[in-house]
Amino acid sequence: MELGKSIENQNNVVARLAKKVIETDVANGSNVVFSPMSINVLLSLIAAGSNPVTKEEILSFLMSPSTDHLNAVLAKIADGGTERSDLCLSTAHGVWIDKSSYLKPSFKELLENSYKASCSQVDFATKPVEVIDEVNIWADVHTNGLIKQILSRDCTDTIKEIRNSTLILANAVYFKAAWSRKFDAKLTKDNDFHLLDGNTVKVPFMMSYKDQYLRGYDGFQVLRLPYVEDKRHFSMYIYLPNDKDGLAALLEKISTEPGFLDSHIPLHRTPVDALRIPKLNFSFEFKASEVLKDMGLTSPFTSKGNLTEMVDSPSNGDKLHVSSIIHKACIEVDEEGTEAAAVSVAIMMPQCLMRNPDFVADHPFLFTVREDNSGVILFIGQVLDPSKH
């Protein structure tokens, strides 16, 4: 399978995953952001350390022929960047293993050589809070301070889970980029944003009257806002339904129409009468393992010992399974550009227009941050209420 086709397949999975996550949390009126790339990398690591049956289930879920393909997707955008102050994409991988166990040589080699992962031996059983602090410090460092806590030291369930663990795998993604055309902060003004319940909130909207990458489709518009470039081309995409309550129908279309995210891309700038999009600054956290299980990916999470290629342990190395995958992401969008970060942690336990169009994002919409050369989606989410941080 060609790499491009593999990425397109993964983007179809991304769309279905986004729908599942949003359906899970939409009743709470949540803004949503997460990094499918971060989750995919973690699943790739788990696949590499699994028995053949579990590995095949993960690859089938991700619609990828091999873990090599998954690694190539990440390498496509993680490498090749140039040093510039207004564009940064960094990924990091961390591993914490109990002092009573050790990594199998082949898995250790993969972690260190392919993923450049940092590995630490810790005492899960008697020092769970110290382990939690160490993981949180790692997340803080590798997200430039955007995510200071991924595991809670005040949650008794988390402490119990850590105490009974053998291995923790973590992946972090940090992205910061300036717009290729920055917004004029003097034009930013408060306006009404229409909520799904019919109420409105006043939030600051960025404005522009410049030509935009904008295209109208049946029932929705797509706006592409490019960032500054190096060898990679990153853009934010905003998918805005025409109807103020049209988000659910648009989400259904995105998740059921194969290739949607790769085929609805504005390629040409067009004059606009007005562009207004709200400033954003919010975070979102969810238990990715529960969503993945609901979508049919169950083998890594059963206590049958399917992760046989990761750890040698005198007592339970052959009974390792994923207890949970926790994912947290945050995003900030302002006149200068976008800053976003995400951390995934897996805890292992034994057992057409006649006039110049407007683009006014004053009601709930979907968004992605995408690398356009490869098609890889770094972040995806929804905005229901920009006033919520």
Swiss-Prot record:
Q: Does the keyword Repressor apply?
A: no
Matching CDD domains, A to Z?
Answer: serpinP_plants
A Gene Ontology molecular function term of the record? serine-type endopeptidase inhibitor activity
Which SUPFAM superfamilies does this chain map to?
Answer: Serpins
Q: Under the cellular component aspect of Gene Ontology, which terms does the record hold?
A: extracellular space
What are the residue positions of the site described as Reactive bond? 351-352
Output the PROSITE patterns linked to this UniProt entry.
SERPIN (PS00284)
Keyword Transport in annotation? no
Q: Which domain of life is it from?
A: Eukaryota
Q: Which UniProt keywords apply?
A: Protease inhibitor, Serine protease inhibitor
User: Which InterPro entries would you find in this protein's record?
Assistant: Serpin_CS, Serpin_dom, Serpin_fam, Serpin_sf, Serpin_sf_1, Serpin_sf_2
What ranges does the record give for the region RCL, renumbered to this chain?
Answer: 337-361
User: What's the domain remark here?
Assistant: The reactive center loop (RCL) extends out from the body of the protein and directs binding to the target protease. The protease cleaves the serpin at the reactive site within the RCL, establishing a covalent linkage between the carboxyl group of the serpin reactive site and the serine hydroxyl of the protease. The resulting inactive serpin-protease complex is highly stable.
Q: What does it do?
A: Probable serine protease inhibitor.
Q: Report the sequence similarity comment from the record.
A: Belongs to the serpin family.
Name this polypeptide is given: Serpin-Z3
